[in-house]
Regions:
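Signature of dsDNA virion morphogenesis modules
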Residues: 1-177
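Terminal short linear interaction segments
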Residues: 175-203
Length: 203
């Protein structure tokens, strides 16, 4: 499966010891059971969808803007935690290193309210399509199981370009599957008609 990215707009939190700089920073990367309109179809992530990926103990990175050279933490180093919270949503925290200029800059931007969104990169193991009032047949995609989680990121801008490209690609595959299914049904109808004509002729 192709790697995809999604962004959630919400509060990026931080915890401080006394009046000093935050000792831990984090946010919500994904909200479950909430329908998102991606412009080509609707999408919802089911509660429990992240359990499979998190059970693998994969080394998930916390990056700034999904940039590999702007690493904020990683789970194997115990400088980042990625987990499902009490609401079933995907949450993450990371421990800033204030000797690192990137960390200092990101934390200050979060404290000022300049960064309020989080994103995550993932692949899908199990999904299904259903009817959507807005997009019609197979217009709603339900993500049931996430295969892998690669990184979580506080982001300056939502990953709109990546998300739109993902949505276009997924919609194209969906449309192709619909055409194949329609062709199969058409062929099946033709076969039934031939059989009926043959029976009528023999009769």
């Amino acid at each position: 499966m192709k790697q995809e990215k999604r962004t959630f707009t919400g509060t990026v939190n931080f915890r401080a010891a006394g009046e000093g700089m935050p000792t831990e920073v984090g946010g919500i990367a994904a909200v479950v059971n909430s329908v998102t309109d991606l412009g080509y179809f609707e999408e919802v992530i089911m509660a429990g969808a992240f359990d499979n990926a998190l059970s693998k103990d994969y080394d998930i990175r916390c990056l700034f803007n999904h940039e590999a050279d702007l690493i904020l933490g990683r789970t194997k180093a115990d400088t980042c935690r990625v987990f499902v919270n009490g609401d079933g949503n995907l949450e993450y925290t990371w421990i800033p290193d204030y000797e690192n200029p990137t960390h200092m800059s990101v934390v200050r931007s979060i404290m000022r309210g300049d960064i309020t969104q989080s994103s995550f990169a993932f692949t899908i193991k199990e999904q299904n399509w259903s009817e959507s009032e807005k997009y019609g047949t197979m217009g709603k995609r339900t993500i049931k199981v996430i295969e892998d989680l690669y990184d979580v990121s506080p982001v300056t801008y939502p990953a709109y370009d990546d998300t739109e490209a993902d949505a276009r690609s997924i919609a194209a595959i969906r449309d192709q599957e619909l055409e194949i299914e329609a062709a199969k049904q058409s062929q099946a109808s033709a076969d039934i008609l031939k059989l009926a004509l043959a029976r009528y002729t023999n009769y």
